[in-house]
Amino acid sequence: GFPTCGETCTLGTCNTPGCTCSWPICTRD
């Protein structure tokens, strides 16, 4: 749930391992 991935997912996917898309940013936990 924390925006610590430094990645956006405007296309709906996250490339960072362990991160999920919470549009429009990737989050972890």
UniProtKB/Swiss-Prot annotation:
Crosslink site: Cyclopeptide (Gly-Asp): G1-D29
S-S bridge residues: C5-C19, C9-C21, C14-C26
InterPro entries: Cyclotide, Cyclotide_moebius_CS, Cyclotide_sf
PTM field: This is a cyclic peptide.
GO terms, biological process: defense response
Domain characteristics, as noted in the entry: The presence of a 'disulfide through disulfide knot' structurally defines this protein as a knottin.
Family: Belongs to the cyclotide family. Moebius subfamily.
Protein name: Cyclotide mang-A
Taxonomic lineage from the root: Eukaryota, Viridiplantae, Streptophyta, Embryophyta, Tracheophyta
